[in-house]
Amino acid sequence: MTGRDSLSDGRTSSRALVPGGSPRGSRPRGFAITDLLGLEAELPAPAGPGQGSGCEGPAVAPCPGPGLDGSSLARGALPLGLGLLCGFGTQPPAAARAPCLLLADVPFLPPRGPEPAAPLAPSRPPPALGRQKRSDSVSTSDEDSQSEDRNDLKASPTLGKRKKRRHRTVFTAHQLEELEKAFSEAHYPDVYAREMLAVKTELPEDRIQVWFQNRRAKWRKREKRWGGSSVMAEYGLYGAMVRHCIPLPDSVLNSAEGGLLGSCAPWLLGMHKKSMGMIRKPGSEDKLAGLWGSDHFKEGSSQSESGSQRGSDKVSPENGLEDVAIDLSSSARQETKKVHPGAGAQGGSNSTALEGPQPGKVGAT
């Protein structure tokens, strides 16, 4: 075989390898990577670069003529990457006579597909994304600063409210004297006693209640310091009795027959007697004021009235105090009327019976 035959064979084989330039009578190509690129399974060894003046070799892309543009040929026929390497259309004719770049010299592409010509650096985000991230970061920082300012504004009023103290009541000497006097009589005054103190001292009732609470705490602290454990026990029992309306135990009442000193709870018994005395005084006044009438002040009372009055004088003062402590109800009044069935028609016997403890009326008779 001569050199011309080998050259013609090489040109026909190169035309067969170029995609899009298939010879007549060849089998249809598939869609595989090797078929699309025009690569055969067995390629001959590349020939030397100095064998001819034209484009030679089994896998050489045809050099474009002087009137054709290499970039357009590379875009239409050659795969990606080969057209960029073989763009010689703009070169002078002397350079076009040089041997073209052989396909065998180019490294084969991987079967998974052509590699990108210029991969971008993944670390560099696009400028639009970078600006968006910066704006997001700026907005988040602004929102954080605004939220912190709001929290500071919310915290400052709370601190101001915490620092603000309640107005303390300043008691005068007269007010303290009245309060101490009431405390010596009863450590647990009821609402009526507190209202009376409020009228006397010109203080609100809730301030008086708070003063009594503080005074009781001070008293308990002093008794603990002095070692009065029994007094503290009596004091706690007395407070429970007043708060829950519990009567005085029978054991304490029975032990009081020999006097306060012989009692098992002298302090509790003394406080109980003081409180009972305060209850009896307004009760007796109300009872006498309700039962007094115009008949008590008339001159020339009848003999029946004087006899009933003498009978009432014989009643002991203890029984009189017990009658005063009884609840003033209609049933109690009816019972007192039944005790004296032979009284006058206007009920003068009942009224004169209650006048026994009064010294002025007794002297008049």
From Swiss-Prot:
Residues 19-37, 300-310 have a biased composition (Low complexity). Its main location: nucleus. Changing residue 166 to W: In KTCN1; sporadic. GO terms for molecular function: DNA-binding transcription factor activity; DNA-binding transcription factor activity, RNA polymerase II-specific; sequence-specific double-stranded DNA binding; transcription cis-regulatory region binding. It is found in: Nucleus. Keywords: Corneal dystrophy, Developmental protein, Disease variant, DNA-binding, Homeobox, Nucleus, Sensory transduction, Transcription, Transcription regulation, Vision. SMART domains: HOX (SM00389). One of its GO terms (cellular component) is chromatin. It comes from the Eukaryota. PROSITE patterns: CVC (PS51496), HOMEOBOX_1 (PS00027), HOMEOBOX_2 (PS50071). Changing residue 160 to D: In KTCN1; uncertain significance. Residues 113-128 have a biased composition (Pro residues). InterPro entries: CVC, HD, Homeobox_CS, Homeobox_domain, Homeodomain-like_sf. A motif (Octapeptide motif) lies at residues 31-38. Changing residue 239 to R: In KTCN1; uncertain significance. Belongs to the paired homeobox family. It is linked to Keratoconus 1: Frequent corneal dystrophy with an incidence that varies from 50 to 230 per 100'000. The cornea assumes a conical shape as a result of a progressive non-inflammatory thinning of the corneal stroma. Keratoconus is most often an isolated sporadic condition with cases of autosomal dominant and autosomal recessive transmission. Craniofacial anomalies and anterior segment dysgenesis syndrome: A disorder with extremely variable expressivity. Clinical features include wide interpupillary distance, abnormal corneal endothelium, unusual pinnae, partially to completely empty sella turcica, posterior fossa cyst, anterior encephalocele, and/or hydrocephalus. Binds to the 37-bp core of the locus control region (LCR) of the red/green visual pigment gene cluster. May regulate the activity of the LCR and the cone opsin genes at earlier stages of development. Dispensable in early retinal development. This is Visual system homeobox 1. It comes from Homo sapiens (Human). The lineage of its organism: Eukaryota, Metazoa, Chordata, Craniata, Vertebrata.
